[in-house]
């Protein structure tokens, strides 16, 4: 279990460092409003799946993911300088749309509540 705890700890460190690198160091104009949602590191610390949330339309998301793919080498080398690891995991970026799904559900719930209020008012008349 200690290997799993270590992978979680490394993932959290990577999330913090990647967020700072994307904010301060990466100058690719394709990379817009990106949030690092979660980093899952394999037990052997060889692979890291980085879940990102991107603000924008589908085209902007595609461009951002392409920008992240092209910046992977730079990000990996910068992480190697900042984190004291024997092996630097390979970085794999994945789009996380759970925030958008949550916003859509919240929007639908608001619409349902408004319709319920409207129907209650109509019944009362």
UniProtKB/Swiss-Prot annotation:
Q: Name one Pfam family in it.
A: RBFA
What is the originating organism of this protein? Symbiobacterium thermophilum (strain DSM 24528 / JCM 14929 / IAM 14863 / T)
Report the GO terms under cellular component. Answer: cytosol
Q: Which family does it belong to?
A: Belongs to the RbfA family.
Query: Which purpose does this protein serve, as stated in its record?
Result: One of several proteins that assist in the late maturation steps of the functional core of the 30S ribosomal subunit. Associates with free 30S ribosomal subunits (but not with 30S subunits that are part of 70S ribosomes or polysomes). Required for efficient processing of 16S rRNA. May interact with the 5'-terminal helix region of 16S rRNA.
Q: Which domain of life is it from?
A: Bacteria
InterPro entries (alphabetical): KH_dom-like_a/b, RbfA, RbfA_dom_sf, Ribosome-bd_factorA_CS
Which SUPFAM superfamilies does the UniProt record give? Answer: Ribosome-binding factor A, RbfA
**Summary of subunit composition and partner proteins:** Monomer. Binds 30S ribosomal subunits, but not 50S ribosomal subunits or 70S ribosomes.
Any idea what this protein is called? Ribosome-binding factor A
PANTHER family in alphabetical order = RIBOSOME-BINDING FACTOR A, CHLOROPLASTIC-RELATED
Instruction: Give an example GO biological process.
Output: maturation of SSU-rRNA
| Record NCBIfam families | rbfA
Q: Which gene encodes it?
A: rbfA
Keyword annotations of the record: Cytoplasm, Ribosome biogenesis
Compartment list: Cytoplasm
Q: What molecular function does GO assign, one term?
A: ribosomal small subunit binding
């Amino acid at each position: 279990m200690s290997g799993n705890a270590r992978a979680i700890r490394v993932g959290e460190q990577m999330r913090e460092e990647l967020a700072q690198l994307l904010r301060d160091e990466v100058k690719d104009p394709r990379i817009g409003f990106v949030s690092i949602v979660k980093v899952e590191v394999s037990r052997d610390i060889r692979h890291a799946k980085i879940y990102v949330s991107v603000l924008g339309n589908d085209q902007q998301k595609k461009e951002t993911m392409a920008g992240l793919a092209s910046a992977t080498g730079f990000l990996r080398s910068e992480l190697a300088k900042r984190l004291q690891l024997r092996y630097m995991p390979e970085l794999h970026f994945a789009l996380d749309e759970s925030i958008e799904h949550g916003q859509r559900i919240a929007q639908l719930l608001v619409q349902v509540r408004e319709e319920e209020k409207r129907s209650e008012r109509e019944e009362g008349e």
